[in-house]
Design a protein with these regions (language model features):
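Structured, solvent-exposed acidic/aromatic patches
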Residues: 1-189, 201-209, 233-235
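Long, intrinsically disordered, low-complexity segments
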Residues: 114-117, 128-129, 136-141, 230-281
Length: 281
C-alpha cells in the first residue's frame, strides 16, 4: 500500500498541448459527418466540429495566425458536409437539425433537460446596454422594435403551453425530450466570429478579412441592418465582441471567456462590467 500523492497541477502550456492533441486525433479519425441510423446528426461531433473547436482553443491561446487559418478552413469546407449559415431564429426552431449547428448534445431525462434549465433565462443589464448601443432608436421590450432582432427575438417568443413569453432560443415545452433538449455547444456562426477576431488581432491587411467574416455572419442573421465598413479600425475588435455577445446570448456562456481574453489583452476593463471582480488570478 502506498499513500496517495498529490500530483502537480499541469501548467497552462501542458494543458493546451493535451487539449490540442485530443482535437488533432479527432480531426484525423472522426467522420466528416456523424451519422445516426444512417442519417446525418448534429448531436454528435465530427471532423468539422473538432476543427472548429481547435480554432477556438487557438484563439484562446493567442495563436491568432493558426486560429484564423483553421477557422477559415472550416468556413470554406463546411458546406461540403451540409453545414451553413441560416436565418437566425430558424436555428432554434430546427434545433440540432439546423445546418448552422456544428455540435448540439442533448439529454433525455426530464430532470436534466436543458430546456427546463434555460428556457426562462433572461437578459442582463449589460446585454441590454450592448443592444441599446447597437440601435440608437429607443427600444420597446414589448414589441422588440428598436432592438437588434438577435436580442429581441429570444425574449419575445410566446410559450406554446401558457402563451406567456419565454426564451425564444428554447421554444418548446419543458416536458418534451429528444430534439427539444438541444444545447447549443458550437455553431458555424461562432466560427465566423472566431475568424474575424483572429484576423483583426493581426491588424494591417488582415482587417479586410475580419470585416468580411463579420459582415457575412451579420448578413445571414440580421440581413440589411449593419454595414461593417463604417466601423473604424480601432473599434473593430470591440464590435466583433459585442456582435458575438448578442448572437450567442443564452447559449454556451462564451461571452465570459471573451471578456477575460479581451481584458488580458488590455482591450476591456472587465471591472466596469463585473465590479465584484477583485483579481485576475
Amino acid at each position: 500500500y502506498r499513500e496517495p500523492l498529490a500530483k502537480a497541477r499541469s501548467t497552462v502550456a501542458e494543458s493546451y498541448k493535451f487539449i490540442e492533441s485530443d482535437l488533432d486525433s479527432a480531426i484525423l479519425y472522426a467522420p466528416d459527418m456523424p451519422m445516426s441510423n444512417y442519417t446525418p446528426t448534429h448531436a454528435q461531433a465530427g471532423k468539422t466540429t473538432a476543427q472548429a473547436l481547435k480554432a477556438k482553443v487557438l484563439l484562446s491561446k493567442g495563436d491568432y495566425v493558426n486560429a484564423a487559418l483553421l477557422a477559415d478552413e472550416v468556413i470554406q469546407t463546411a458546406g461540403n458536409y451540409g453545414y451553413g449559415l441560416v436565418d437566425f431564429m430558424s436555428i432554434f426552431s430546427d434545433m440540432f437539425d439546423s445546418p448552422e449547428v456544428l455540435f448540439a448534445p442533448y439529454v433525455s431525462n426530464y430532470e436534466e433537460q436543458c430546456s427546463f434549465i434555460l428556457d426562462r433565462t433572461t437578459y442582463s443589464s449589460y446585454s441590454q446596454k450592448i443592444a441599446d448601443a447597437m440601435d440608437p432608436t429607443p427600444g420597446n421590450k414589448e414589441t422588440g422594435e428598436g432592438y437588434d432582432p438577435r436580442f429581441a427575438a429570444p425574449f419575445l417568443t410566446p410559450d406554446v403551453i401558457t402563451t406567456s413569453f419565454k426564451n425564444g432560443k428554447y421554444p418548446h415545452s419543458t416536458n418534451d425530450d429528444g430534439k427539444s433538449n438541444t444545447y447549443y455547444f458550437l455553431r458555424l456562426g461562432e466560427v465566423y466570429y472566431i475568424h474575424a477576431e483572429a484576423e483583426a488581432r493581426q491588424g494591417g491587411n488582415h482587417l479586410a478579412a475580419a470585416r468580411t467574416s463579420l459582415q457575412t455572419v451579420l448578413d445571414a442573421h440580421v440581413p440589411g441592418v449593419y454595414d461593417v465598413s463604417t466601423i473604424p479600425d480601432n473599434q473593430l475588435l470591440e464590435m466583433i465582441r459585442q456582435h458575438k455577445w448578442i448572437d450567442l446570448l443564452f447559449e454556451n456562456q462564451e461571452e465570459w471567456y471573451d471578456m477575460i481574453r479581451y481584458y488580458k489583452h488590455g482591450d476591456l476593463d472587465i471591472t466596469t462590467i463585473r465590479p465584484n471582480i477583485k483579481s485576475d488570478k
